[in-house]
Design a protein with these regions (language model features):
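Active-site environment of divalent metal-dependent phosphoester hydrolases
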Residues: 11-16, 40-43, 69-73, 134-135, ...
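Residue-level marker for buried hydrophobic side chains located in beta-strands
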Residues: 6, 32-34, 63-64, 126, ...
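His/acidic metal-ligating clusters that form di-metal
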Residues: 104-128, 133, 138-190
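N-terminal active-site segment of His-dependent metallophosphoesterases
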Residues: 1-51
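Active-site-proximal beta-strand elements of phosphoester/diester hydrolases
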Residues: 3-11, 125-131, 203-205
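Conserved beta-sheet core of the metallophosphoesterase superfamily
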Residues: 168-229
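Divalent metal-coordination and catalytic microenvironments
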Residues: 9, 37, 66-67, 93, ...
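Active-site neighborhood of divalent metal-dependent phosphoester bond hydrolases
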Residues: 41-123, 148-159
Length: 245
């Protein structure tokens, strides 16, 4: 049976990615939707991109672009590394590309350029890295950076009264547009939780792989999920992005 599986923020943790694909028994029949932030953090960002390029050649994959991916795309395009990016995990990505040829760098750049801002799948499910602010949906978003940086969508879902009916005038209009919304970007660790969180119709799959958490993959139909080992256990001699926690 073909499954649709969503994967949270990876942040250079290639070992974690391999673990969750194995633990979920992923086959070439499964559709994989990656929610972005493949890079910046642990030491294997370029290895992840190379793996994903090859993976997409043999099975259906959808790659959403995260804010860290946009930073890396800019660096691959212009070789201009901002201090903010380097501090937030970019240095590990730069280091991982140290032995790449210009031809291979261009292949990876093309991969970043092909990433999607968002994807609407079967049964009206939205997959987006961060969120959107327009009550008319992401296609009407004025500030495209919100696809990768917004936190208000998640904060709205978290703060909502659970008793609020969808028929209420107070129910957030932008949440009514989709059956379900799958996001990453804001680690569930911020709420002291190491597993995916569901608030209203929003599912947050960023379980803190950049920091002390694990990487998560979820079957979007059944909501069954699998996690890697905590990333510090997989990279015991590295800090990931824990320098900014």
């Amino acid at each position: 049976m073909k499954r649709t599986l969503a994967i949270g923020d990876i942040h250079g943790g290639f070992r974690a990615l391999k673990q969750v694909l194995e633990r979920a028994n992923v086959t070439e029949n499964d559709k994989l939707i990656f929610l972005g932030d493949y890079v910046d953090g642990w030491s294997e960002s370029s290895e992840i991109i190379q793996f994903l390029i090859r993976l997409s050649e043999k099975q259906e994959c959808i790659f959403i672009k995260g804010n860290h991916d946009a930073w890396t795309e800019d660096w691959l395009s212009f070789r201009n590394a901002s201090d903010v990016w380097l501090f937030n995990g970019g240095q590990s990505t730069v280091d991982s590309y140290s032995d790449y040829s210009q031809e291979d760098l261009e292949i990876h750049l093309e991969f970043f350029e092909r990433m999607k801002n968002y994807h609407v799948g079967e049964e009206n499910r939205l997959f987006i890295h961060a969120g959107y602010s327009s009550m008319h949906g992401p296609e009407k978003e004025v500030y495209f950076s919100n696809y990768r940086w917004d936190r208000t969508l998640w904060e709205t879902a978290v703060a909502m009264d659970k008793k609020l009916s969808k028929n209420s005038e107070l129910y957030p209009k932008r949440l009514l547009l989709y059956k379900e919304i799958f996001i990453g970007h804001t680690p569930t660790l911020h709420l002291g939780i190491k597993e995916p969180i569901n608030k209203a119709n929003v599912w947050n799959l960023d379980t803190g792989a950049a920091f002390t958490g694990a990487l998560t993959i979820m079957d979007v139909d059944t909501k069954e999920f699998w996690q890697s080992d905590p990333l510090p256990a997989l990279y015991p001699n590295e800090k990931g992005r824990n320098n900014i926690m």
